């Protein structure tokens, strides 16, 4: 089974479409939060995720958008209320099984308080191995990680909409996991909003 992973789309529908293109054929799509901005909704991004029956979780931006602080942002008349309700109904974490592999989806960390930025060089990265899962997937930092820690593979696909990782020349990125071979591919691709050359 091929599982596609995106995170931190931040309203960039073209970035999400391009991620789906470079992933190739996938069986499941996972979104690790921050599909939107804290004060900006995207009908296009929510529609694509819903149409693809993606397994979505909230990030810190959804938490603000759907809190009292985001009430003015939610009142914009152009927002599709069915799509907003779809995104609002998502949890902040998910445990799922694909084939025989157990996946834990979080936006920042599996431990409380949520919100810590765990970069690839962080000593806290090893804490992900405490999870009862074969794969722990997270976003939040916009920085790619693929690391085996004990029996757990930790994956951060980077950002499919707001590139900030200098290690890949600030390209957008996504990931694909093959649950039969445990192969993880992180795929870089250009952000068409910023043409090169």
Question: In which residue ranges do the predicted regions lie?
Answer:
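Core catalytic region of metal-dependent phosphoesterases/phosphodiesterases
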Residues: 2-92, 96-97
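A short C-terminal boundary segment appended to hydrolase-like catalytic domains
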Residues: 183-197
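Active-site-proximal segments of metal-dependent phosphoesterases and phosphodiesterases across multiple
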Residues: 70-76, 99-132, 162-165
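Active-site-proximal beta-strand elements of phosphoester/diester hydrolases
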Residues: 2-10, 102-109, 153-158, 186
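Short, Asp-centered acidic motifs that coordinate Mg2+ and/or phosphate
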Residues: 28, 55, 103, 134-135
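Short acidic-hydrophobic surface loop/beta-edge motif
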Residues: 92-100, 145-150
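Conserved beta-sheet core of the metallophosphoesterase superfamily
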Residues: 119-181, 185
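Active-site environment of divalent metal-dependent phosphoester hydrolases
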Residues: 10-15, 37-40, 62-67, 111-113, ...
């Amino acid at each position: 089974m091929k599982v596609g992973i995106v995170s931190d789309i931040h309203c960039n529908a073209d970035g999400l479409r391009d991620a789906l293109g470079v992933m190739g054929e996938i069986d499941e799509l996972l979104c690790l939060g921050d599909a939107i901005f804290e004060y900006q909704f995207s009908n296009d991004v929510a529609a694509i995720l819903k149409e693809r029956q993606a397994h979505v979780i909230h990030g810190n931006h959804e938490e603000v958008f759907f809190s009292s602080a985001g009430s003015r942002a939610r009142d914009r008349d152009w927002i599709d209320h069915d799509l907003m309700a779809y995104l609002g109904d998502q949890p902040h974490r998910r445990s799922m099984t694909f084939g025989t592999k157990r996946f834990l989806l979080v936006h920042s960390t599996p431990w409380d308080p949520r919100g810590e930025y765990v970069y690839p060089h962080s000593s806290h990265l090893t804490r992900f191995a405490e999870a009862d899962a074969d794969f722990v997937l997270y976003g939040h930092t916009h920085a790619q990680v693929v690391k085996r820690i004990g029996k757990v593979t930790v994956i951060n696909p980077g950002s499919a909409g707001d590139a900030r990782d200098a290690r890949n020349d600030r390209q957008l990125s996504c990931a694909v996991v093959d649950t039969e071979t445990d192969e993880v591919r992180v795929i870089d691709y250009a952000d068409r909003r910023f043409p090169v050359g």
